[in-house]
From Swiss-Prot:
It comes from Homo sapiens. The lineage of its organism: Eukaryota, Metazoa, Chordata, Craniata, Vertebrata. This is Lymphocyte antigen 6 complex locus protein G5b. It holds the Pfam family UPAR_LY6. Disulfide bonds join 28-55, 31-40, 47-73, 81-98, 99-104. Coiled coil: none annotated. Residues 1-18 form the signal peptide.
Length: 201
């Protein structure tokens, strides 16, 4: 009887000592804007969150074609895992997917792991009209502090960091402003390094 008790105690001690500590943080791929045909346009870094949170991929579709992808560290207060949602425009909809391992929200293919060089004279063209740009990002529930625009003009005296450009093409400087909006909206936990340095446009 004593031998069985001793063996039981040793087994319990072995299980206790042999447990591998669970990391307190999870590391995910981060890309603020990814075009499947080009790669990661802005971001191409990593972000970290608590191990109880999940990595997330938000795929934005135009009809049935993948148009943009956002990768980052998801928060429960934002998009729900496996959620599909339409935007205000019937052609655009998105799906949110989550996973629970380090770097599980991987790139579409190996060549997409590095960001593109930032050109000085070529803007990023989006398939949206001037009037749709502000509504599209609002439709994605990003809680952007956008003012009311009249006749396609921007009121004087507004801080450029709290407005989105209504031009058809977005420069990389404007993508950085969009990054700030996303970072404050609760959509994703985004890294600070490497994205906020001013760049001439």
């Amino acid at each position: 009887m004593k031998v069985h008790m001793l063996v039981g105690v040793l087994v319990m001690v072995g299980f206790t000592v042999g447990k591998v500590p669970v990391p307190d943080i999870r590391t995910c791929h981060f890309c603020l804007v990814e075009d499947p045909s080009v790669g990661c346009i802005s971001g191409s870094e990593k972000c970290t969150i608590s191990s109880s949170s999940l990595c997330m991929v938000i795929t934005i579709y135009y009809d049935v074609k993948v148009r943009f992808i956002v990768r980052g560290c998801g928060q429960y207060i934002s998009y729900r895992c496996q959620e599909k949602r339409n935007t205000y425009f019937a052609e655009y909809w998105y799906q949110a997917q989550c996973c629970q391992y380090d770097y599980c929200n991987s790139w579409s293919s190996p060549q997409l792991q590095s960001s593109l060089p930032e050109p000085h004279d070529r803007p990023l063209a989006l398939p949206l009209s001037d009037s749709q740009i502000q509504w599209f990002y609002q439709a994605l529930n990003l809680s952007l502090p956008l003012p009311n625009f009249h006749a396609g003009t921007e009121p004087d005296g507004l801080d450029p960091m709290v407005t989105l450009s209504l031009n058809l093409g977005l420069s990389f400087a404007e993508l950085r402003r969009m990054y700030l909006f996303l970072n404050s909206s609760g959509l994703l936990v985004l890294p600070q390094a490497g994205l906020l340095t001013p760049h001439p446009s």
